[in-house]
Amino acid sequence: MTTPPDKARRRFLRDAYKNAERVARTALLTIDQDQLEQLLDYVDERLGEQPCDHTARHAQRWAQSHRIEWETLAEGLQEFGGYCDCEIVMNVEPEAIFG
């Protein structure tokens, strides 16, 4: 049977781990949650006009228009399953990244 200090210690360790994991996830992207949501809205809107061609051309265009270094952002998006525009919209979830 666990004692209250053991439970408190486990809770503290679990919370510290979850916080460290969240910080590590957010460090993969060079943009904040607001910018990510803007990017997703932009790409989703463009995909309604021009279907995905299996590149991240719309995301890259958004990054360039916001003066965000594309190569680093692309690496971060790929870490979350966003290899092309449609995958960015489908797989990159701000809530999962930023908590």
From Swiss-Prot:
Source superkingdom: Bacteria
InterPro entries referenced in this protein's UniProt entry, alphabetically: DUF2695
Name this polypeptide is given: Uncharacterized protein Mb2294
UniProt cross-references to Pfam families, sorted A to Z: DUF2695 (PF10905)
Species: Mycobacterium bovis (strain ATCC BAA-935 / AF2122/97)
